[in-house]
Structure formats: structure tokens, C-alpha cells
Amino acid sequence: MKTIWINAGELSGDMQAAALLTALREREPELAAIGMGGPNLARAGQKNLFRVESLSVMGIMEVLTALPRALHMLSRIKKEMARLRPDAVVLVDAPEFNFRVAKIAHGLGIPVYYFIPPKIWAWRTGRVRFLQRYVKRLFCILPFEPAFYAKHGVQVDYIGNPLVDMVNWPELKKIEPIKGRIGLMPGSRRKEVEALLPEFGKAARILLQQGRDVTFHCLRAPNMPEEKLRALWPSDVPVAFDAPEDRYTAMR
């Protein structure tokens, strides 16, 4: 039985990686998956040895504070990877962390694949040398990326964005926009939400005080309990917190 290690460093990557794992298991039902992920990968059948929620950080000060935790996690990943010896490692987004995981896997002789590689065509192009050295093949979700990576001698495939298949487009097209409804998207990182949502609430209060005919809907990330969000929101400002599974309907 083949075993892959999927390393998703962000909750958004966890969602993408879950779609990838589901597709892989349709082709190889006996495929085992271990690694780092969140609730979506867990539902897709991965045994999460490390939780992605413990890694997500925002801002330079929080990054510095989280550095010892990240280094400790990398040490544990190296130990588990050496013990379990997966057949392949699939990295998902989050280059600041996953580049270090790539070095670990490469040092152990485990082939490394990158799903949703960093946008080095936009900035810090020199990072392509890292991919040339440590990554066996890239799987891109943007159609123009393969030409860029191929030009630099990196093996690459364009596989499309799996999230597109998750959206029920015919049903979404039936939804009529609601005049005056304002959608709020504070993110999925704890510090990010704690910083942004109270400010969103202040702005919402100003709009209501001005007599605007508006309502507010906040898109809740899967890792954010509604009670946590309500504690950050002004109690005198009405708001609806939409469940994560309703996000596309709410955005439409």
C-alpha cells in the first residue's frame, strides 16, 4: 500500500489538498495519507499528525513569536517522516514553511511534489532555483504558470483549480443579489480575525448611524466558532454569521 505525506500549511490549502486527495483515492482506493492538515483533509481520509491551525500566523511580530513553535514542529516532522518513510511528500502552498519541509524530505531521499507552488513569477523569482533542486514536479492551478516553470527547467503540470468543481454554478446563477447586503470576510487566522473583525464592526456601526439601509453577513471560517466571532463584534450592531459551507452562496 502506497503512503503519501500531504503538508498543507494554510486552511485554504487544506481545502485544496482535500480535493486532491479525494481525486487520488478515486484512482487508488488503497492510498494512505498522513501529514499536516485541517478538517477538510481529515474528512478526505488523511491522518493529520500535525494541525494546520497551529501554524497560521499574521504579521511580523506574530511570525517572530511563532518561530520557536514552527522550528519545534519542523523537528517533529523530520522525526515522523524518518520513522514512517512515506512514498512521496506533497507540499501545498505556504512556501515559507513548506520549503523547509521540502529540504527535510529531500534529505531523507523521499520524492517531493508541490501542489500550488509559490507565485515566484510575481516576486522573488530566484526561488525557482530551490524548486529546481528540491522538488521533483509541480502541479499548478493557473493556466499560465507551466510556461514560466518549464522555461526554468522545472517539471510541471497544469491540473486546474479543484475548488471550481466544488461550486454548484447552475444553482449560484439562480441567486439574485440582495440590495444593501454587505459581506464581511475577516479571514481564517486567529490574529487576523481578532485584528479585523472589531474594525469591521466599527465601520458597520457608522453606516447604520448614517441611516444606510444595509445588513451585514460575515463569512465564518471552519476553524472559527460563531461565539468567538460574536465576542469580537459590537453587540449593538446586527450581523449574521454564515456557516462555512454556505460561503459561495453568501458571496454570490
Q: Where on the chain are the PLM-derived regions?
A:
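Active-site and donor-binding regions of nucleotide-sugar-utilizing enzymes
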Residues: 2-174, 184-199, 206, 210, ...
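Proline/glycine-enriched tight loop/beta-turn segments at coil->beta junctions
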Residues: 177-178
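Short, aromatic/basic amphipathic alpha-helical patches
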Residues: 228-236
